Amino acid sequence: MSKIIGIDLGTTNSAVAVLEGTESKIIANPEGNRTTPSVVSFKNGEIIVGDAAKRQAVTNPETVISIKSKMGTSEKVSANGKEYTPQEISAMILQYLKGYAEDYLGEKVEKAVITVPAYFNDAQRQATKDAGKIAGLEVERIVNEPTAAALAYGMDKTDKDEKILVFDLGGGTFDVSILELGDGVFDVLATAGDNKLGGDDFDQKIIDFLVEEFKKENGIDLSQDKMALQRLKDAAEKAKKDLSGVTQTQISLPFITAGSAGPLHLEMSLSRAKFDDLTRDLVERTKTPVRQALSDAGLSLSEIDEVILVGGSTRIPAVVEAVKAETGKEPNKSVNPDEVVAMGAAIQGGVITGDVKDVVLLDVTPLSLGIETMGGVFTKLIDRNTTIPTSKSQVFSTAADNQPAVDIHVLQGERPMAADNKTLGRFQLTDIPAAPRGIPQIEVTFDIDKNGIVSVKAKDLGTQKEQHIVIKSNDGLSEEEIDRMMKDAEANAEADAKRKEEVDLKNEVDQAIFATEKTIKETEGKGFDTERDAAQSALDELKAAQESGNLDDMKAKLEALNEKAQALAVKMYEQAAAAQQAAQGAEGAQANDSANNDDVVDGEFTEK
């Protein structure tokens, strides 16, 4: 079987690795670097990727950076006189990685395992898979970055039982995953994150500071000058890296712009203390996902054996200190934060080819999935942090008599009401035979594959007709939407519960009216008019309350109707039981008569 390469497709940098024997090895790019900038530029129709593209970013406006942040959206980038989708730009990076991996291996590479942030939604995962396909790669598996890191960390520790926390702060995304390792099984217990938090945000804080200071001194806003801004970005990234090793750095950008008196230069000193002050809010934002993941996993900090740091941004001293303070543990520094994800992806490639044995990877889905049901309620079929691949079915029915079709509205999120969650797709199951409401049986099945990609099926159990959809949304969940879902779910829990209670009550009232009307009709002329009249009276009162919309009145009248309807049902069952008993008695008497009337012949037996 041909080699399966492991690719860490990062926001700012990417890496590729391959399994050699039982060891995962990072493949250096043509410039000898073990990571490649995720940068694409266009010059005279030529596509340039990696270090060369990054070097000319200052002078070449046709340069695309941080494309990963646009994956799963319908946003396009204009360059080279064309419009490109994020998948196409990502595919150019993947092609470059694939090319130098082939040069190293001396053979064609057609398959890859590609990593994504654990908090990537369905659209973003699908977009990543599509990018691989465009690059000529068969994507064997999409693996969550923290999970891949854990795989690389734990490969030589398969005989140990450990619970580890992976803290993954990359260039554009942040994930926290809790895993349990033991006997070769890598079991993800929970994952949380922030899809809009990473090294780029730390760089931006420095850029904003430099722009503000320069404006104070010279009255010129550098953020309006595209070329100056690119130089500031490069300087900010360098300063950030410098401050991981020293306590002060000098930022020097000669001829950054020109004023009325001639050229202007930017000369500024930045201390680590000032950098920490500028980025304090970003460091604070890393704490909530850590607590969320621990809570979802049902673990306390004392139960965590190791904390693994992943991603170049975990080299920032303030981040390391925050991790120590939050977990009470010294982070494990046995893995290279820039390379460990690609190495883990290559190990997963080895698991697929059979070169790595006795390793099982159990990943999870980051957000709950379900459909919209009556009253706009979000009915979850698969909860967040469910191990994948997984499949879940639930039977629903029609909401009206003779309903010919049902709309299946597929959603992802954590809020109780459908309108507050993210639509993944819609489809329709048609040609449902005419029947009273509640009679047709519509089975809805959700499947999440090993890559976290969703497909949904609706089947009419009566006719066996079914419709199927693989979710391929063009506008994936934005980072704000994911963050909003989790934060809103907590902030609005009380209001959500009230709204859901209202809808549930209205649905219950509707169902009770329907069921009681049916019972009253079925018992007409059967001799218990007192109970029927009482039920009818309670039914009329509930309908009046329903019309008024007063929830307390509806609740009281619903209880009264349930009591009267139950009394009517008891009479029905008593009558049915009496009729059945009478029928059985008649059958018994008939059998006895038949036995008594049988002719009996006495005979004499003679032995000869």
Swiss-Prot record:
Annotated GO MF terms: ATP binding; ATP-dependent protein folding chaperone; unfolded protein binding
A Pfam family: HSP70
Compositional bias of kind Low complexity: 578-598
Role this protein plays: Acts as a chaperone.
Keyword set, alphabetical order: ATP-binding, Chaperone, Nucleotide-binding, Phosphoprotein, Stress response
Protein's recorded name: Chaperone protein DnaK
Coiled coil: none
Keyword check for Ribonucleoprotein: no
Membership in a protein family: Belongs to the heat shock protein 70 family.
